[in-house]
Amino acid sequence: MEKAKFVIKLILQLALIMLITFIGTEVQKLLHIPLAGSIVGLMLFFLLLQFKIVPESWINVGADFLLKTMVFFFIPSVVGIMDVASNITMNYILFFIVIIIGTCLVALSSGYIAEKMLEKSNTRKGTDHS
């Protein structure tokens, strides 16, 4: 019986996550926002969580499940790369340069944004020690 309750809770929470993503996609289409609908849904989801409209307890089991199974979502990307492996082997140096530059840009921009958000949070709390 416990297992059945867990599975039902998981399905309902995943459905809620998918619903918010779907709403984000529809908002993006309606307002012609130049972002992917899933990103709009992610921002909407973030706001719903921040303002406690959607409590964390409503999605914790579903979110944990998605985090634990995230690796499987990248398998199609790897399979797609295998389709163009011959092109990559011909230009492998350029391919790796692009990967290294892209990784560095993502790491640098993520770090910069995280620092700015932390500074803003500390300033708001009055604990700016920089």
From Swiss-Prot:
GO biological process: cytolysis; killing of cells of another organism; programmed cell death
Intracellular or extracellular location(s): Cell membrane
Primary location recorded for the protein, binned into one broad class: membrane
Superkingdom classification of source: Bacteria
GO cellular component: plasma membrane
Bilayer-spanning residue ranges: 6-26, 31-51, 65-85, 93-113
Alphabetical list of InterPro entries matching this protein: Holin-like_CidA, LrgA/CidA
Keywords in alphabetical order: Cell membrane, Cytolysis, Membrane, Transmembrane, Transmembrane helix
DNA damage keyword on record: no
Topology in membrane: Multi-pass membrane protein
Family: Belongs to the CidA/LrgA family. CidA subfamily.
Entry function: Increases the activity of extracellular murein hydrolases possibly by mediating their export via hole formation. Inhibited by the antiholin-like proteins LrgAB. In an unstressed cell, the LrgAB products probably inhibit the function of the CidAB proteins. When a cell is stressed by the addition of antibiotics or by other factors in the environment, the CidAB proteins possibly oligomerize within the bacterial cell membrane, creating lesions that disrupt the proton motive force, which in turn results in loss of cell viability.
The protein's name: Holin-like protein CidA
Source species of the chain: Staphylococcus epidermidis (strain ATCC 35984 / DSM 28319 / BCRC 17069 / CCUG 31568 / BM 3577 / RP62A)
